[in-house]
Amino acid sequence: MIIKPKIRGFICTTTHPVGCEANVLEQINLTKARGPIVNGPKRVLVVGSSSGYGLSSRIAAAFGSGAATIGVFFEKPGTESKPGTAGWYNSAAFDKFAKAEGLYSKSINGDAFSHEAKAKAIELIKADLGQIDMVVYSLASPVRKLPDSGELVRSSLKPIGQPYSSTAVDTNKDTIIEASVEPATEQEIADTVTVMGGQDWELWLNALDEAGVLAEGCKTVAYSYIGTELTWPIYWHGALGKAKMDLDRAAHALNDKLAAKGGSANVAVLKSVVTQASSAIPVMPLYIAMVFKKMRAEGLHEGCMEQILRMFSERLYKADGSAPEVDEDNRLRLDDWELRDDIQQHCRDLWPQITTENLPELTDYFEYKAEFIKLFGFGIEGIDYDADVNPEVNFDVIEL
């Protein structure tokens, strides 16, 4: 079929398998160009490995460190009449390129929150790898099915205490609007912590530990974002922030547990990037368009892949084997460049000046849109989007 982009709200409902493969290859080539990650991990489990930071982590481990990887994700394959999700095609491409280089690659497609996914991952590790030395936790999901009761819990992208109003961009109409979001109820806050907090990360590590598959010195990392006062009302001081604070709580508990075997658990605070997850957060697209332009001008721009490579080589797996620098909460900070005073002051000064008319000139808004559509495999140079492509892409994946 011939596949063109169809955008609805903040998601693109179509995906291009060839474009998604090109994205993955671009990240692999970037990783190889950086050279090997000295002292990197060799047997890695990535929970949430099909897009964004999770996919980049799997690529860094495999193509930067020669690691065997197991990826867990929840994606839809394509059928003859309908494309699959971008994450499906990303994972298929990763598997293809990893196997071509003789790297071990196995994937599990199912609900990562379930007991079943954990049991299947443990079974694979025991059968094929024995133990693992790194666990990356990179889930972004709006809903969690509680594994014991089967209850569906939903997260909310809302402020706490009072309504939040701010200048934002309508990404469908490319116009500047005033966005208003009502505050979360106590129940919505609690539910957001249940879905996006650290509980499932702990459940994964506890299950892996009890099964005896965590190697001596095993490291685990989960990803977070803090941002600045420009996004705090909707993010860090909102319902999502409470969940991310719970991730910090889990990190301390897990770090105590893993320290006994010479390992560690950290939250890594990453920079804002264009992902399916961030595009759903009110105000983030406008903030990203502003901060990206300034960071590009300063030579500090990083996408998902560059961020993760810096986390591996300059934090967790330093060439000299020294311990990573952490903040007062034991977090790895990769948002350090974004949070530079000059970068943030620029955004603060610019925010009130933005209009629909000057949006393209004062920000990297259209670059943001191009990067967003690229997540789904579109707008990539050298790809013929009028060509017939097969939406059915099969690979070595265990379906739960």
From Swiss-Prot:
Query: Which BP terms from GO are recorded?
Result: fatty acid biosynthetic process
EC numbers listed for it are 1.3.1.9
Protein residues bound to substrate: Y225
Gene Ontology MF annotations:
enoyl-[acyl-carrier-protein] reductase (NADH) activity; NAD binding; trans-2-enoyl-CoA reductase (NADH) activity
InterPro entries to which the protein is assigned, alphabetical:
Eno_Rdtase_FAD-bd_dom, Enoyl-CoA_Rdtase_cat_dom, FabV-like_NADH_b, Trans-2-enoyl-CoA_reductase
Q: Which UniProt keywords apply?
A: Fatty acid biosynthesis, Fatty acid metabolism, Lipid biosynthesis, Lipid metabolism, NAD, Oxidoreductase
Give, as in the UniProt entry, the pathway in which the protein acts. Answer: Lipid metabolism; fatty acid biosynthesis
Does the entry annotate any disulfide bonds, and if so which pairs? none
Annotated residues that bind NAD(+) are located at 48-53, 74-75, 111-112, 139-140, 244, 273-275
Q: Enzyme class, one word?
A: oxidoreductase
Q: Does the keyword Cytoplasm apply?
A: no
Gene3D superfamilies linked to this entry: NAD(P)-binding Rossmann-like Domain
The record's active-site residues are Y235 (proton donor)
Record's catalysed reaction(s): a 2,3-saturated acyl-[ACP] + NAD(+) = a (2E)-enoyl-[ACP] + NADH + H(+)
Q: Cite the position(s) of the site with description Plays an important role in discriminating NADH against NADPH.
A: E75
Q: Which family does it belong to?
A: Belongs to the TER reductase family.
Role of this protein: Involved in the final reduction of the elongation cycle of fatty acid synthesis (FAS II). Catalyzes the reduction of a carbon-carbon double bond in an enoyl moiety that is covalently linked to an acyl carrier protein (ACP).
How does the annotation summarize its subunit structure? Monomer.
Recorded protein name is: Enoyl-[acyl-carrier-protein] reductase [NADH]
The organism is: Shewanella amazonensis (strain ATCC BAA-1098 / SB2B)
Q: Which gene encodes it?
A: fabV
